[in-house]
A protein has these predicted regions:
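A hydrophobic, multi-pass inner-membrane permease signature
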Residues: 1-191
């Protein structure tokens, strides 16, 4: 969903393009905490409280504009001449996106994926403790909160659970590290 939208914002001209980009930027200025009460009322009206959707829908609503904004700026750095050469050879816009633009944008896609993942992971705690009171729907960050009692904290168990939750993320970051560095440094030098 983010890739075609970011590509359209980077390459196409359409009505209300700047207005919708400004709206995306405005959405990024608000955190989930500011909109908790309205989100709670909407989710309650839709009957989505105490479900997985109670965490997925607000997270997607906040993170898709972030992903579009970040990826659009990366796609604008890719030379248009490469796409024009593909069009001259008879390629369609979708084929050009898939075979020309996306391979060049892979470092940017990885950076956007990691940024969106970190945002989702951070918001997950807030949305989980607000919109889900059922234990089986609680994600790891909210589950770690269970180790904090009224009088004491069971540090040993909490640290073991935190390490178990962080290890898969660390392994993914280790494998994607070269793409992350390439994507972060791609716009650092002016040519």
């Amino acid at each position: 969903l983010v890739i075609p939208a970011a590509y359209a914002y980077a390459r196409l001209d359409f009505p209300f393009k700047n207005a919708s980009l400004s709206l995306f930027l405005g959405v990024n200025m608000f955190t989930g905490a500011v909109l908790l009460i309205p989100l709670y009322r909407v989710l309650r009206t839709l009957g989505m409280l105490n479900t997985y959707w109670a965490m997925i829908v607000p997270g997607v609503a906040f993170l898709i504009p972030t992903g579009i904004w970040l990826l659009r700026s990366y796609l604008e750095k890719i030379p248009v001449e490469l796409e024009e050469a593909a069009f001259v050879d008879g390629a369609s816009r979708l084929y050009t996106l898939r075979r020309v633009v996306l391979p060049l944008a892979l470092p940017g896609l990885i950076v956007v994926s990691i940024a969106v993942f970190i945002g989702a992971y951070a918001q997950q705690f807030l949305f989980a403790i607000t919109f889900n009171q059922t234990r089986e729907y609680q994600p790891l960050p909210a589950g770690l909160f269970e180790f904090i009692g009224y009088q004491s904290v069971t540090w040993n168990e909490m640290m073991a659970a935190a390490l178990t939750g962080v290890l898969p993320v660390m392994v993914i970051f280790l494998f994607l590290q070269k793409y992350l560095i390439a994507g972060l440094t791609a716009g650092a030098v002016k040519e």
